Regions:
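Outer-membrane beta-barrel proteins, especially TonB-dependent receptors
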Residues: 1-210
Length: 210
């Protein structure tokens, strides 16, 4: 509280991170990667003495009009809890013969790859009298083929799909407006995308590529 206004300049926060990754590499060049991670974060904001307790939350709701009722001003606060879970699976497989470049003394090989990724994010928060709850589930799928005509000439083609599943609600009580004491905002929606792509690359040594 550098400006001494009784409010935290930055939220008080704590975070937990857990992750696990695996890699399997076969003798033929095939690689399989998979893993997951989990993150949880809590952020407490508002006045310096505010704590995330039921008693203090109820005091904010009950005594919002503390001046008119000649009551003690309740402590204002906010709290955010974020949770994120992610899992992924990737497999890459070489296909066809390799193409060799005698100048580079190296070879390239065409390959087929598949990637699946799932992400879940949830937020449970309140800011004074306003409550927000949101969940997002995202699934991404990508199938890609990379073909080498020569060491410096290649074509990538692929298809991909993307699904977003949103569930969001904002509870916005305004007790000082009798006709609109409680208002709920619903932002639920689903978004889907699918597409295909192609990319050709030609490289002149390490100096230029198109």
């Amino acid at each position: 509280d550098h400006n001494h206004d009784g409010f935290r300049d930055l939220p008080k926060s704590d975070q937990i991170n857990v992750a696990n990754k695996w890699l399997y590499a076969a003798d033929n060049g095939t690689q399989v990667r998979w893993g997951w991670k989990f993150v949880q974060e809590n952020r407490l904001g508002g006045m310096l003495d505010y704590k995330n307790t039921r008693t203090m939350r109820e005091a904010m709701e009950k005594d919002w009009d503390w001046r008119a009722g000649d009551k003690k001003m309740p402590l204002y606060g906010s709290h955010i809890r974020n949770r994120n879970a992610n899992g992924y699976f990737k497999v890459g497989m070489p296909v066809g013969p390799a193409v060799y470049d005698p100048d580079e003394q190296d070879e390239m090989r065409s390959n087929l790859a598949f990637v699946a990724d799932f992400d879940h994010f949830s937020e449970d928060a309140y800011f004074g009298l306003n409550d927000y709850r949101g969940n997002e589930n995202t699934l991404s799928l990508n199938l890609m083929y990379n073909h080498y005509f020569t060491y410096r000439s290649s074509l990538i083609v692929g298809v991909q799909g993307h699904l977003d599943y949103y569930r969001e609600k904002l509870l916005n009580p305004t007790p000082w407006i009798a006709a609109n004491s409680v208002r709920n905002y619903d932002f639920d929606r689903n978004e889907r995308e699918a597409g295909a792509y192609a990319e050709y690359t030609y490289a002149i040594k390490d100096k230029f590529s198109i």
